[in-house]
A protein has these predicted regions:
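C-terminal cap of thioredoxin/glutaredoxin-like
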Residues: 1-4, 50-52, 72-75, 132-185
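Secretory/periplasmic and organellar redox-cofactor proteins
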Residues: 1-48, 144-146, 156, 176-178, ...
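Extended aliphatic helical segments
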Residues: 11, 24, 42, 53-55, ...
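Generic detector of short, locally flexible boundary/turn motifs and exposed helical patches
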Residues: 15-22, 46-51, 127-133, 138-139
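Short amphipathic alpha-helical surface micro-motifs
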Residues: 36, 64-67, 148
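Residue-identity detector for glycine
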Residues: 39, 45, 108, 123, ...
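Structural alpha/beta surface segment adjacent to cysteine/selenocysteine redox centers
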Residues: 54, 59, 65-143, 153-159
Length: 185
């Protein structure tokens, strides 16, 4: 029994070691479709990182809220660049995407991350009134330009499911999860 347990532990270590080799990750991702990895200026983390995580997210999506929580590990490790591209599948909800963009543009990345976390935790139930406390200037042309950039990215990729996560423009290979990305840089 002890021998089997030791052997299993050794195999797990070897697998983890191999899995965290960026060359292995890149090789597995090589045959996947590639998408534009610069679809947003809503970015968090290390701007010089060689790892770009693109998050295609719907502010009202519960799995997107769960993904945002999982991304906290990457955000706080500061080992990659995380960019958000917002979508909604109901045009009436586009205003929330614009509010989230406005928070980023008017308060900066650090505060925006906190606000996004609060939104996904329970702010979404308050809808537009959630943003009242921020006194956002919603008449900025920059908000509309960024919103249209997100819309264009959505049209060009033809993604229709959220959350969709890309790493350096490709989908995460089988056997990996988003938390593994912090070890690839």
């Amino acid at each position: 029994m002890f021998s089997f347990s030791s052997e299993l532990q050794k195999v797990r270590w070897q697998y983890s070691h191999m899995k965290m080799n960026k060359k292995v990750f890149d090789f597995l991702q090589h045959n996947e479709a590639k998408y534009d990895a610069d679809g947003s200026s809503v970015k968090f983390g290390d701007p010089n990182s060689n790892i770009i995580v693109t998050v295609f997210s719907n502010p009202y999506c519960n799995p997107c809220a769960a993904m945002h929580k999982r991304l906290q590990v990457l955000y706080f490790s500061n080992t990659c660049l995380i960019q958000y591209i917002f979508t909604s599948f109901n045009p009436e909800w586009n205003k929330i995407n614009k509010y989230l963009i406005a928070v980023y543009q008017q308060y900066g990345a650090e505060k925006a991350w906190e606000v996004y976390t609060e939104w996904y935790d329970n702010g979404k139930y308050s809808q537009e009134s959630f943003f009242d406390k921020f006194h956002l200037d919603m008449n900025s042309d920059d908000i509309e330009r960024e919103f249209q950039r997100h819309e264009q990215w959505k049209r060009s990729t033809k993604f229709n499911a959220t959350p969709t996560i890309l790493v350096n423009g490709g989908k995460i290979p089988y056997g990996y999860n988003i938390e593994d990305v912090q070890y690839l840089s």
